From Swiss-Prot:
<dbReference type="GO" id="GO:0006508">
    <property type="term" value="P:proteolysis"/>
</dbReference>
<dbReference type="InterPro" id="IPR050131">
    <property type="entry name" value="Peptidase_S8_subtilisin-like"/>
</dbReference>
<dbReference type="InterPro" id="IPR036852">
    <property type="entry name" value="Peptidase_S8/S53_dom_sf"/>
</dbReference>
<dbReference type="InterPro" id="IPR023828">
    <property type="entry name" value="Peptidase_S8_Ser-AS"/>
</dbReference>
<dbReference type="GO" id="GO:0005576">
    <property type="term" value="C:extracellular region"/>
</dbReference>
<feature type="active site" description="Charge relay system">
    <location>
        <position position="189"/>
    </location>
</feature>
<keyword id="KW-0720">Serine protease</keyword>
<feature type="glycosylation site" description="N-linked (GlcNAc...) asparagine">
    <location>
        <position position="393"/>
    </location>
</feature>
<feature type="active site" description="Charge relay system">
    <location>
        <position position="158"/>
    </location>
</feature>
<feature type="domain" description="Peptidase S8">
    <location>
        <begin position="126"/>
        <end position="397"/>
    </location>
</feature>
<feature type="propeptide">
    <location>
        <begin position="20"/>
        <end position="116"/>
    </location>
</feature>
<dbReference type="InterPro" id="IPR000209">
    <property type="entry name" value="Peptidase_S8/S53_dom"/>
</dbReference>
<keyword id="KW-0378">Hydrolase</keyword>
<feature type="signal peptide">
    <location>
        <begin position="1"/>
        <end position="19"/>
    </location>
</feature>
<dbReference type="Pfam" id="PF00082">
    <property type="entry name" value="Peptidase_S8"/>
</dbReference>
<protein>
    <recommendedName>
        <fullName>Subtilisin-like protease 3</fullName>
        <ecNumber>3.4.21.-</ecNumber>
    </recommendedName>
</protein>
<dbReference type="InterPro" id="IPR037045">
    <property type="entry name" value="S8pro/Inhibitor_I9_sf"/>
</dbReference>
Length: 397
């Protein structure tokens, strides 16, 4: 993706500053006022980073006193496989100062991120598992390798997960929460996606371990910086438990284009975590959405029971694979089930099959390519420039 590094709100104020330090978020009206993500150049040391943060804190305090600003300054720092960044709440004068530091790569607005699910249809049939394990449609049986993701850890970065649901018994733990103080799934979206990627009944990788990472509220929204903080936690956790190379991460969420979001998932993938991402539900080119537009991850578009593109699904050359996403039955908080539609439902199918492949010895670096190689070329009207490959687990059926 090309970087046109400009922040429009500072055109006059920062005209004399090196243009390489600016970045413009393409499209969208979801900017969080006065909130920014600052990304450092590769090779910046921990000492240089800490020195920069201290300098920013001093500048922010000075500008706050001088102008009566109500901004809160630096909030969280991130280090994802050597990718250093931070977010904060700053006035324009402080951002102008930040952009003058030659250690800064770019700055972008923090933005609202939302889940990628649509409608609920009561009592709809469950069909996705049968479809991804057969070359032809209409089969209800799910055929899969008996390893079923055993030994793999899947991070559900979402609205949280009901860790007491019987679908996940003995295989789940709570990870972290970057959005609020409520360590439950008040929305149900995260429980549903987890049920698809690793539930005992409705899941693809039925023996995988699960970690709940909450980055979206009960209302289904969060921030780019909150998602990045969650991803940072996942990489740190996997490294501490020596599971890099044996881990997957599902992101059934998205927002408008964000280079920081794309960089974060890319570094997570490079660290050794298979990343599956929802393409989005706007029936437009997914190149305008993040983190779906990150080339390094496995981006999933949504298909229907009759092997067509779901009407809502994003499309485009950035899409790696189609997967079942319309009317998918899975787990719901409180022990029940519900049916949802969206690319949010397609992504966990991809995540689950990817995790199962990792358990069989496929590398993180090759997993998405393998999915594309064996996918069935059956999707009708996939969209301009979009693959017609449908997810297949290689069962031989």
């Amino acid at each position: 993706m090309g970087c046109i590094k400009v922040i429009s709100v500072f055109l006059a104020a920062v005209a004399a500053v090196d243009a390489r330090a600016f970045f413009h978020n393409r499209g969208g009206n979801d900017v969080i006022p006065n909130s920014y993500i600052v990304v450092m150049k590769d090779g910046v040391t921990a000492e240089d980073f800490d020195s920069h943060i201290s300098s920013v804190a001093a500048t922010h305090s000075l500008n706050k006193a001088k102008r009566g600003s109500e901004t809160v300054g630096h909030k969280d720092s991130f280090n994802i496989n050597g990718w250093r960044a931070y977010n904060g709440h700053f006035d324009e004068a402080t951002i102008e100062s930040i952009l003058k530091d030659d250690k800064v790569n770019y700055v972008e607005h923090d933005r609202v991120v939302k889940l990628a699910a649509l409608t609920t249809q009561p009592n709809a049939p469950t069909w996705g598992l049968g479809r991804v394990s057969h070359k032809a449609p209409g089969n209800k049986d799910f055929v899969y390798d008996s390893s079923a993701g055993q030994g793999i850890t899947i991070y559900g970065v979402d609205t949280g997960i009901d860790i007491h649901h019987s679908e996940f018994a003995g295989r789940i733990r709570w990870g972290t929460n970057t959005v609020d103080n409520d360590n439950t799934d008040g929305n149900g979206h995260g429980t549903h996606t987890a049920g698809t990627f690793a539930g005992t009944t409705y899941g693809v990788a039925k023996k995988a371990n699960i970690v709940a990472v909450k980055v979206l509220s009960a209302g289904g929204s969060g921030s780019t910086s909150g998602v990045i903080k969650g991803i940072d936690w996942c990489v740190t956790d996997a490294r501490s438990k020596n599971t890099l190379g044996k881990a997957a991460l599902n992101l059934s969420l998205g927002g408008s284009f964000s280079q920081a979001s794309n960089d974060a998932v890319t570094r997570a993938q490079e660290a050794g975590i298979f990343v599956a991402v929802a393409a989005g539900n706007d029936n437009r080119d997914a190149k305008n959405s993040s983190p779906a537009s990150a080339p390094a991850v496995c981006t999933a578009a949504s298909s229907t029971i009759d092997d067509q593109k779901s009407s809502f699904s994003n499309w485009g050359t950035i899409v790696d694979i189609y997967a079942p996403g319309s009317n998918i039955l899975s787990a719901a908080p409180g022990g029940g089930t519900r049916t949802l539609s969206g690319t949010s439902m397609a992504s966990p199918h991809v995540c689950g099959v990817g995790a199962a492949m990792l358990a069989q010895g496929v590398s993180v670096a090759q997993a998405c390519n393998r999915l594309k190689q064996i996918g069935n070329a059956v999707i009708r009207n996939p969209g301009t420039g979009t693959t017609n490959r449908l997810l297949y687990n290689g069962s031989g059926r």
